[in-house]
C-alpha cells in the first residue's frame, strides 16, 4: 500500500499547509511514540523509551519541536532536545546514547518556508518503509493521552554539539592533521553553523566560515551546497586551498578546489573509491544512482570496481550497499555514504574523507580525478500538479523516444518524479553539452504542456 505522508526523506512540505501543521505534527509525534513504545525492546523491559529531537535553523523549528514533544509525551515517551544539530549528528547520538529513535526537523536544502520530519531508528539508520507505514496506520487511530503518571518527560541534551564534534574528528586518520591548510567552510546558515567550523579548526586547519549567521529565514539562501557560487567566490577571494559546502541539515557535500573548480558527489565518490583501493588493495563495489554520471561508472569498472545504480535517494543507495555488503556509495547531489564511518550520509565526515585522500596521496583533487571526464548532463526541474498523470502522456513518450533514438546509445535519458516536492526531473546525458541541452529542453517542453 502506498504511503500517504512519508516520501523518500521523511515528511516534508510548506509550513502551515498539510501535513506540516502543528496539529498534524503533534499527532505524528503521538503515532510514532505509540509505534516505538510498542516495540519488543521496550514492551518486554517495562522501561519507557526515549527519543532525541534535533532541528535545523528554520524559524518554524520551534513550533514543530514543541508539537512533536507534546505528541511523544502524550504517548508516554521521554524526549531529549538537542537543539540545532546536523541530521547525521542526530543519527550518531541516537545510536551512541542507545535511544529508541531520533527525529530531525528539517527540510534539508529547501527554503526556510518549508520544513519536514524524518526519523532514525535506534541503530542510527533511517526507518524502514514498513515502520513508516505502521506510523501512518497509527495516525488513523484516535489520540488517547497516557495517564498523568505515564506521561513522557523532556530535557535538554546540553553536550550534544561536543559529542558530535568529537565523533567527526574520530573518523579522520590519527596520522594526519590539517595544519597548513586554509579552508572555507560554508554552513548554509543551517544546522552545522556551529559544529562544522570547530571540527576543521580543531584538526588544525585555518577556517574561514561563511553561512554561519542563521536568523530563521536565511537557510540555504544563496549559500551552501545548493548554491556553491558563494563558496567559489570565497575560496578565490581568500586564496584558500579548498572550500567545503554543506546544505541546511549538513548531510550533503560539495567541494571547491583552489582554482574554483566544483566537485560533485559523483566525482567525490570516484576519488574516495580510488583512495580505498590504494589503501586496502581492493574495493569490491560501489553504489550510485540512476543519475550518476556514466563516466564515473566506466572509470570504476575499468579500475576493477563493480558499480550498481540505485533509485534516487540516499535511503536506496544504503539499501544497495547493505544488500551487496559494500561500504561506499553516493548521489551526485553530494549525499555520500561510507558505512565503515557512519550509518548515514554526513557532509562533515565526507569532507574529512576527501581531505584524508588528498593527504594520503599528496595530490590535489584535480590530480586525483585525472583521466575522468564527466559526460555533459542537463537537468531540468518541471513543476507540475501533485496529481498530474505524466506517465500516460503520448507527447512525453514521443519526446523521450526521439531523444533516445538520436543519442543512439551514446547517452541517457532519465525522467523521474521528485520524492519530496511536486517536480518532474528531466535529465539528459550526452557526449556533448549541446545535445544534452537540446533534448532535455524538448522533453521538458512536452512535460509542461502535458501537465499544465
Curated annotation (Swiss-Prot):
BP-aspect Gene Ontology terms: carbohydrate metabolic process; peptidoglycan biosynthetic process; UDP-N-acetylglucosamine biosynthetic process
Tell me the residues on which Phosphoserine occurs. Answer: 108
Q: What class of enzyme is it?
A: isomerase
InterPro entries in the cross-refs: A-D-PHexomutase_a/b/a-I, A-D-PHexomutase_a/b/a-I/II/III, A-D-PHexomutase_a/b/a-II, A-D-PHexomutase_a/b/a-III, A-D-PHexomutase_C, A-D-PHexomutase_C_sf, A-D-PHexomutase_CS, Alpha-D-phosphohexomutase_SF
On cofactor binding, the record's note says: Binds 1 Mg(2+) ion per subunit.
Reading the lineage from the top rank, the first entry is Bacteria
**Which GO terms fall under molecular function for this chain's record?**
magnesium ion binding; phosphoglucosamine mutase activity; phosphomannomutase activity
Pfam families from the entry? PGM_PMM_I, PGM_PMM_II, PGM_PMM_III, PGM_PMM_IV
Q: Which SUPFAM superfamilies match?
A: Phosphoglucomutase, C-terminal domain, Phosphoglucomutase, first 3 domains
State which Enzyme Commission number(s) the record gives.
5.4.2.10
Name the cofactor(s).
Mg(2+)
Q: Where is the active site?
A: 108 (phosphoserine intermediate)
Post-translational modification as stated in the protein's UniProt record:
Activated by phosphorylation.
Q: Which residues bind Mg(2+)?
A: 108, 247, 249, 251
What Gene Ontology cellular-component terms does the record carry? cytosol
The record's keywords, sorted A to Z, are:
Isomerase, Magnesium, Metal-binding, Phosphoprotein
Kindly indicate where the leader peptide sits in this chain. none
Q: Give me the reactions it catalyses.
A: alpha-D-glucosamine 1-phosphate = D-glucosamine 6-phosphate
**Gene3D superfamilies xref list:** Alpha-D-Glucose-1,6-Bisphosphate, subunit A, domain 3 (3.40.120.10), Alpha-D-phosphohexomutase, C-terminal domain (3.30.310.50)
Q: What does this protein do?
A: Catalyzes the conversion of glucosamine-6-phosphate to glucosamine-1-phosphate.
* HAMAP family recorded: GlmM_B (MF_01554_B)
Which family is this sequence assigned to? Answer: Belongs to the phosphohexose mutase family.
The identity of this protein, by name, is Phosphoglucosamine mutase
Amino acid at each position: 500500500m502506498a504511503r500517504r505522508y512519508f516520501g523518500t526523506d521523511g515528511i516534508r512540505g510548506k509550513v502551515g499547509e498539510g501535513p506540516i501543521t502543528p496539529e498534524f505534527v503533534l499527532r505524528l509525534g503521538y503515532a510514532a511514540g505509540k509505534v516505538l513504545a510498542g516495540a519488543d525492546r521496550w514492551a518486554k523491559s517495562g522501561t519507557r523509551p526515549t527519543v532525541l529531537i534535533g532541528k535545523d535553523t528554520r524559524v518554524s523549528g520551534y513550533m514543530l519541536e514543541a508539537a512533536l514533544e507534546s505528541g511523544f509525551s502524550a504517548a508516554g515517551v521521554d524526549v531529549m532536545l538537542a537543539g540545532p544539530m546536523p541530521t547525521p549528528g542526530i543519527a550518531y547520538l541516537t545510536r551512541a546514547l542507545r535511544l529508541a529513535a531520533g527525529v530531525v526537523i528539517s527540510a534539508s536544502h529547501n527554503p526556510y518556508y518549508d520544513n519536514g520530519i524524518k526519523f532514525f531508528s535506534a541503530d542510527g539508520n533511517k526507518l524502514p518503509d514498513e515502520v513508516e507505514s505502521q506510523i501512518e496506520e497509527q495516525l488513523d487511530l484516535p489520540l488517547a493521552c497516557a495517564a498523568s503518571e505515564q506521561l513522557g518527560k523532556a530535557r535538554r541534551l546540553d553536550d550534544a554539539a561536543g559529542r558530535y564534534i568529537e565523533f567527526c574528528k574520530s573518523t579522520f586518520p590519527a596520522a594526519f592533521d590539517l595544519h597548513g591548510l586554509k579552508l572555507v567552510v560554508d554552513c548554509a546558515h543551517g544546522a552545522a553553523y556551529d559544529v562544522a567550523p570547530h571540527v576543521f579548526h580543531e584538526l588544525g586547519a585555518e577556517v574561514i566560515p561563511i553561512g554561519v549567521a542563521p536568523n530563521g529565514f536565511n537557510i540555504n539562501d544563496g549559500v551552501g551546497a545548493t548554491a556553491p557560487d558563494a563558496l567559489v567566490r570565497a575560496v578565490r577571494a581568500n586564496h584558500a586551498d579548498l572550500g567545503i559546502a554543506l546544505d541546511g541539515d549538513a548531510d550533503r557535500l560539495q567541494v571547491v578546489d583552489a582554482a574554483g573548480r566544483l566537485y560533485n558527489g559523483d566525482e567525490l565518490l570516484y576519488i574516495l573509491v580510488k583512495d580505498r583501493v590504494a589503501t586496502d588493495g581492493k574495493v569490491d563495489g560501489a553504489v550510485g544512482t540512476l543519475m550518476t554520471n556514466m563516466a564515473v561508472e566506466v572509470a570504476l569498472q575499468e579500475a576493477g570496481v563493480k558499480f550498481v545504480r540505485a533509485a534516487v535517494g540516499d535511503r536506496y543507495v544504503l539499501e544497495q550497499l547493505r544488500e551487496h555488503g559494500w561500504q561506499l556509495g553516493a548521489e551526485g547531489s553530494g549525499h555520500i555514504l561510507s558505512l565503515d564511518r557512519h550509518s548515514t550520509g554526513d557532509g562533515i565526515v565526507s569532507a574529512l574523507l576527501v581531505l584524508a585522500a588528498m593527504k594520503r596521496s599528496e595530490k590535489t583533487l584535480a590530480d586525483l580525478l585525472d583521466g575522468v571526464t564527466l559526460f555533459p548532463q542537463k537537468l531540468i526541474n518541471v513543476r507540475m500538479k501533485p496529481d498530474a498523470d505524466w506517465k500516460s502522456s503520448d507527447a512525453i513518450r514521443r519526446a523521450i523516444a526521439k531523444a533516445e533514438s538520436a543519442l543512439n546509445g551514446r547517452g541517457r535519458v532519465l525522467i523521474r518524479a521528485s520524492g519530496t516536492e511536486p517536480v518532474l526531473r528531466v535529465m539528459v546525458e550526452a557526449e556533448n553539452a549541446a545535445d544534452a541541452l537540446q533534448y532535455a529542453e524538448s522533453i521538458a517542453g512536452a512535460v509542461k504542456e502535458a501537465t499544465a
